[in-house]
Amino acid sequence: MAWWEAGARILLAILIGLAIGYERERRNKPAGTRTHILVCLGAALIAVMENYVEARVLAINTDVLNTGVAVSMGRISAQVVSGIGFLGAGTIFSSRKKIAGLTTAASLWCAGCLGLVAGMGCYTLA
């Protein structure tokens, strides 16, 4: 992957986080622009790094299928999804039959997923 492509992926993630965060901040909701940008950016950086590591592993060992070495593509990204879910759980509050923060948790989780999608280079999907 060229440096400019990694930069484009990261920039796209920042713009996605900005759009989601701006909408949340405009409505005076918790977890605004900075939080959504950071979640989206962090997820995109992990995706770019994972893509780089996968390319390096496959370049070093082109006979990866014949040697029995198992390369698990997507393992790091899966941990990002569960980690952001854990972060979102911290934004949910319940008191006296009222639950608050579900939309904030969902928006953080979606921002992280969209950051992963942008970081993987699926521009049209993001």
Tell me the role of every PLM-derived stretch.
Residues 38-48, 106-118:
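Small-residue-rich segments of transmembrane alpha-helices in multi-pass membrane proteins
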Residues 1-68, 72-74:
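Alpha-helical transmembrane segments and their membrane-interface boundaries
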Residues 26-39, 72-81, 95-110:
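Short, non-helical or kinked segments that cap or interrupt transmembrane helices
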Residues 56-60, 99-100, 122-124:
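Phosphate-handling active-site elements
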